[in-house]
Amino acid sequence: MSGVRLTVLGSTGSIGTQTLDVARQRGYTVGTLAAGRNLDLLAEQVREFRPALVSVDGSILAEARERLSGVRVIADPSEAAVAQADVVVNAMSGLIGLPPTRAALEAGQAVALATKEAMVTSAHLMWEAAAAGGGRVVPVDSEHTGVYQCLTGEDMGDVAELILTASGGPFRDGPADLSAVTPEQALKHPSWSMGPKVTIDSATLMNKGLEVMECASLYGLPLSQVGVVVHPQSIVHAAVRLRDGSLKAQFGPADMRLPIAYAIDAAPSGMQHPGDVRGARRGEEVGEHLGWPLLGQWEFRAPDLTRFPCLALAYRAGEAGGLLPVALNAADEVAVDAFLHGRIGFLDIPQLIERVLDETPGGALTWDSLTETDAWARARAQELCAYGVGGAGVGA
């Protein structure tokens, strides 16, 4: 696998830097990098991996061209996504990751997809892009690569349920009253090292809700066949229950380099339509294995939807479909940012999201309606945030 040529979109973020760890360990060539505004880290990556093409945020394009001499520098991640590569790893966070995903799939690229918003907000549009251009998709999330591995060799008609595990976040065992939770407390995830947005989503269980929606879209099952189990040890990442009663599970250490490496291995033969699971030949080990026997106690419990209503809101949006997943994603991004900056409280996050969902207009999902609904939901969420903690505009 050392001859693999990668494009890494979102290279300076958490998944992006860990992808480059995998590339470094396995000797992959990195032909293209795309980042936002973290020019210092990007410059280090360019010096090490010597890509031919780099994309940056337009606001730093002139400075980047000056500092990254000898490299072609652009301000268009979608152009970067179609550069020659064996695998495109899209680690861009948020809706800005959708156009590059679409471009890569329409260009026939093999995409290892960490941008969960692509499948949460616009799944059928992404599958249309893959069908049009011959692109392939494999997810990067540990839970979804776990499901992918469990489904390998199985007929989708034999699948009764897909099960995703959740660590439960930093507040799974307390405090009883979450109203006074601070951003600093919420950012202390017990198992995983992630970016701030995903870490807060894990604390509210919204991350698991988004993963449930993504899972249903990836594997072509209704949300009623995608379950969640809280597993504090974060060893079992996913399981598949088959119609004969058998249960297959995937487990491993809480190290994102493993699912990233598997997604890179699997992407060239990845999915072109929901549930199109073909497996992969695996590369060399990139992290420490769990060892055997596996010592210690494993716990599994049902999630508390009263304490963590964001998970229930995600099921609601996913079951409704249409434009509600777009509104959910946009409202959550605004709410999490407001919480991190002290503008609203922890418990205001689900209240704000619910208000936006209640007010979301109906309509069919198209690229235009997605963009319009995203903008509307963000603006409405910002209005609700303006009332502040405990304001009538949020909780009413």
Curated annotation (Swiss-Prot):
Domain of life per record: Bacteria
Entries under SUPFAM superfamilies matching the protein: 1-deoxy-D-xylulose-5-phosphate reductoisomerase, C-terminal domain, Glyceraldehyde-3-phosphate dehydrogenase-like, C-terminal domain, NAD(P)-binding Rossmann-fold domains
Annotated binding of Mn(2+), by residue: 141, 143, 211
Residues noted as binding 1-deoxy-D-xylulose 5-phosphate in the record, renumbered to the chain: 116, 142-143, 167, 189, 202, 207-208, 211
InterPro entries xrefs: DXP_reductoisomerase, DXP_reductoisomerase_C, DXP_reductoisomerase_N, DXPR_C, DXPR_C_sf, NAD(P)-bd_dom_sf
Record pathway: Isoprenoid biosynthesis; isopentenyl diphosphate biosynthesis via DXP pathway; isopentenyl diphosphate from 1-deoxy-D-xylulose 5-phosphate: step 1/6
Pfam family, one: DXP_redisom_C
Any one GO BP annotation for this protein: isopentenyl diphosphate biosynthetic process, methylerythritol 4-phosphate pathway involved in terpenoid biosynthetic process
Residues reported to bind NADPH: 12-15, 36-38, 117, 195
Names of the cofactor(s): Mg(2+); Mn(2+)
Keyword NADP attached: yes
Annotated function: Catalyzes the NADPH-dependent rearrangement and reduction of 1-deoxy-D-xylulose-5-phosphate (DXP) to 2-C-methyl-D-erythritol 4-phosphate (MEP).
Assigned protein family: Belongs to the DXR family.
Protein known as: 1-deoxy-D-xylulose 5-phosphate reductoisomerase
Organism: Deinococcus radiodurans (strain ATCC 13939 / DSM 20539 / JCM 16871 / CCUG 27074 / LMG 4051 / NBRC 15346 / NCIMB 9279 / VKM B-1422 / R1)
